[in-house]
Amino acid sequence: MDYKTSGVDIKAGREFVSEIKQSVESTYSSNVLEGIGGFGGLFKIPLEGLKKPVLVSGTDGVGTKLELAQIKNFHFEVGIDLVAMCMNDIITTGAKPLFFLDYIATGKLEKNQLLEVINGIAHSCRENKCSILGGETAEMPGFYSKNKYDLAGFCVGIADEEKLINGKKICENDLIIALQSNGMHSNGFSLVRKIIENNNQIDKQFEKKYNLDFYDELLKPTKIYFKIVNQILSQNIQIKGMSHITGGGIPENLPRCMSSDFIPYIDKKSWKIPVLFEFLKDVGQIPEKDFWNTFNLGVGFCLIIDKKYKDKILNICNAFDISSWVLGKVLKKNNSKENNFLPEIII
């Protein structure tokens, strides 16, 4: 028995690398010294304008959204998701992304599917001036089924230590600005899949009620917020804290960008929760607490700012065609009786 008979096709792997080369290299900046094909990617660190350069790294995956995406052939979109989940995390520090690496594991290398994934990754990296420096595609027969793949991403950026955004300058009554999500993003899908499993006509119910395709809405790719954050910072507007709203929703993620002395006060009347979330809540009979702790509810990213910058930031967001609004404000913890946002689950 040879390796191919056991389920690993080395030749197909080589051909796959050759086919993705053009897409990957389209993301390269002049700082890439050696990328795809070598044992290690080489990247020249751009230090211009940085007094105390700091590298910022993040890693993430797409979670069980992949299960539905693979069934419905949303392969390009999950490539975008992979970059977004990593990049949105590192930019909360004020970092600019430099390079990205990916890991793909599959039971059998289905070339057309994975080419779409890589094209989605490359598209997002080009859009945000981030080079794909390397990656790994592992064919693992018997460990994964033939029609399944899993993804992991790794993003590295750079910031100036003196300008790091770490929440230390947050004060009472600072404003919380919400940036709209592009639907579900990449969290809560284990619950969603269970709801679908228990309601086999759910897509038809949704389409009849809202005249929208259920899976098109459900599997929209995660929005990447780097461009808008970078534009705000380039206008000498101080952002005191940022939060990427992922697993755990607003209650878990928003407090992470501020010290334990403060608590976020959220005005739940400041926005209308998108219909997809409300529909899932009703069909799945999701308890209120789980609803808030599972989904982003239309809020993909948050900024903590001094109120004097409010109008400038809202105008910049509008120019980027991103809906934004004042979600709430920061309170001292001992003054949290005013809280209108599920106070029993705020940290």
UniProtKB/Swiss-Prot annotation:
SUPFAM superfamilies the record matches: PurM C-terminal domain-like, PurM N-terminal domain-like
CC terms in the record's Gene Ontology section: cytosol
Key word Cytoplasm present: yes
Principal location listed in the UniProt entry: cytoplasm
Record-listed E.C. numbers: 6.3.3.1
Keyword flag Acyltransferase: no
InterPro entries: PurM-like_C_dom, PurM-like_C_sf, PurM-like_N, PurM-like_N_sf, PurM_cligase
Subcellular location: Cytoplasm
Catalytic activity, as annotated: 2-formamido-N(1)-(5-O-phospho-beta-D-ribosyl)acetamidine + ATP = 5-amino-1-(5-phospho-beta-D-ribosyl)imidazole + ADP + phosphate + H(+)
Pathway info: Purine metabolism; IMP biosynthesis via de novo pathway; 5-amino-1-(5-phospho-D-ribosyl)imidazole from N(2)-formyl-N(1)-(5-phospho-D-ribosyl)glycinamide: step 2/2
UniProt-listed GO biological process terms: 'de novo' IMP biosynthetic process; adenine biosynthetic process
An annotated Gene Ontology molecular function: ATP binding
Keywords tagged on the record: ATP-binding, Cytoplasm, Ligase, Nucleotide-binding, Purine biosynthesis
PANTHER family (UniProt xref): TRIFUNCTIONAL PURINE BIOSYNTHETIC PROTEIN ADENOSINE-3, TRIFUNCTIONAL PURINE BIOSYNTHETIC PROTEIN ADENOSINE-3-RELATED
Recorded family membership: Belongs to the AIR synthase family.
Protein name per UniProt: Phosphoribosylformylglycinamidine cyclo-ligase
Source organism: Prochlorococcus marinus subsp. pastoris (strain CCMP1986 / NIES-2087 / MED4)
Lineage of the organism: Bacteria, Bacillati, Cyanobacteriota, Cyanophyceae, Synechococcales
Gene that produces this protein: purM
